[in-house]
Amino acid sequence: MTVCVVYITVTHGAKTNDFCARFCSTWNQHPPKADCDLIVACQGGPLPTETALLFASLKPRFWPRINDGGRDLSAYIEAARTIAKGYDMILALGESVHFAREGWLKRLVEARQRHGPGMYGIWGTHVIRAHLLTTAFFITPSLLASYPLPVTDKNSRYELEHGERALWRRLQSRNMPVKLVTWDSEWSPGRWRVPKNCLWRGDQSGVLMKCNHTERYEAADPVRKRNWEASSNRPFR
């Protein structure tokens, strides 16, 4: 199976250097344990040399592009239609993503081998509507490339992630597997809030990766944590 990791960076972003340094250091500390190529999507043009050098140990391919209103999601769709279309799977990762345990890609590959082409998420919630967060997801390129709506602004980004006709719902309607993947299992829609220590529950140790969403929960006081968990655990719809 050929896998491409598409990692988002924002050229000259306020936090980009810090995010990229953490991404690379935690990748090296906690390796994927599965073969992959890394494509760094440079939103807004080529990265400054000092930022690009942070990736030296990972030997990526840099992909400069316009930082349009679709932000990360339009980049992933374009990658699926162009630079990454020849891979079996794409792992789409937002800029704040980082790692705390080795084998994160191996787990996703295992799930893909078990269930087949489809969409595999890292974090699931029922806030607004049930959805897999698009801060990180693992998907067959042709399925992402076939998303029929333009993604050009905040509203269209949210529609893809958690709208009434979200990407995952479109795939499910075609009988494609849509799974939340944790360290010990894969979970179908309706069961994304079942795992212990998932997103916004317990110590979140069941998640394969960390990001800005997991960090905010970690930093919250006990009352806010309870409120976030209760909101995320609302009935599936």
Where are the language model's segments positioned?
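ER/Golgi luminal nucleotide-sugar-dependent glycosyltransferases, focusing on the catalytic module
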Residues: M1-R237
